[in-house]
Amino acid sequence: MFEAVEEVLREYADLERRLADPAVHADPRTARTLGRRYAQLGPIVEAYRRWKALDADVAAAHELAAADPAFRAEIPALEAEREAVAERLRSLLAPADPNDGKDVIMQIKAGEGGEESALFAGDLLRMYLRYAERRGWKTEILDATESDLGGYKDVTVAIRADGSEGAWSRLKFEGGVHRVQRVPVTESQGRIHTSAVGVLVMPEAEEVDVQIDPNDLRIDVFRSSGPGGQSVNTTDSAVRITHLPTGIVVSCQNEKSQLQNKETALRILRSRLLALAQEEAEAQAAAQRRSQVRTVDRSERIRTYNFPENRISDHRVNYKAYNLDQVLDGDLDGVIQALVDADAAARLAAAEQDPTRPVLSRQR
């Protein structure tokens, strides 16, 4: 009856044992992965233990009430609390996204709207950097192509979370087309323009996740360029890698060293290949990634940022708030939590259609 929970309890105990071994902490990456998984399972274990205790309390109350009716008054409150904990446990046991513990690579790309779109791409980058800063996460700009007015035609950033919650679990919903409505700095008559920026979010892949055959790669080198296309380096330090089987192309020119640019490009390529493999393997992942940017068109929007009204609207969950200035300063938890809750509800509904799901009724 509790097979799924028993598996969690066994894994939790095994992780507890492994994390107590000093040898594990000699490898920081392994220790971090195990610690994150241990923290993820903790709420399930805690809820299950609480449910078991309440189940025993309800049984004891029934036995006492049989001998003394005065104890009957305690039963409804105990049963209500037991059901509330059971509902939480059902939610925790709903199928989880296997990538939730991973870090993120995010690409922000200007679309329709010219220089104004590039400027808003810069605004989005700062928004995500501030959000990461608020949560104590680490960020790293992997590659960037600036526009003439200080925006970004294209920028790629890595975001790494600490603790049990991976950056993917919060930022995976940011993939798609973001539309901005405001008066551009280049607009002399005060007219409101609409521009679009595309955001692509990928779980960061490790080398063990994706094996790349060097024979499948074409590597080209070229000189780095800045705004307006001018050369900013006298050596061929920029790197472009083409993955021949898929046609995926990744360029990197952020570092002064060709070797560093190559390593960064491979890092991005691994994440793109992992995302592609999951898209092809899982219908759910495919549906999710189809909602992300394919062509940066103003009609394929997931979110609108309306400056005149100080309004942010997420069109997937009918979320609307009038705190755009705070959102752009990194206060994203309101809209992200609305998306997390909607996703959890959808996963729970799917799990409830599964006849093999654990049934949390009182043991007799």
UniProtKB/Swiss-Prot annotation:
InterPro entries membership: PCRF, Pep_chain_release_fac_I, Pep_chain_release_fac_I_sf, Prokaryotic/Mito_RF, RF-1
Compartments, as annotated in UniProt: Cytoplasm
A Pfam family it matches: PCRF
Protein origin, superkingdom: Bacteria
UniProt cross-references to Gene3D superfamilies, sorted A to Z: 3.30.160.20, 3.30.70.1660, 6.10.140.1950
Keyword Transport recorded: no
Annotated positions of the N5-methylglutamine modification: Q230
An example Gene Ontology molecular-function term: translation release factor activity, codon specific
Keyword Hydrolase: no
PTM note: Methylated by PrmC. Methylation increases the termination efficiency of RF1.
GO terms under cellular component: cytoplasm
Keywords: Cytoplasm, Methylation, Protein biosynthesis
Similarity comment: family membership: Belongs to the prokaryotic/mitochondrial release factor family.
PANTHER family noted in UniProt: LD18447P
Role: Peptide chain release factor 1 directs the termination of translation in response to the peptide chain termination codons UAG and UAA.
Protein name: Peptide chain release factor 1
Native organism: Acidothermus cellulolyticus (strain ATCC 43068 / DSM 8971 / 11B)
Gene that specifies this protein: prfA
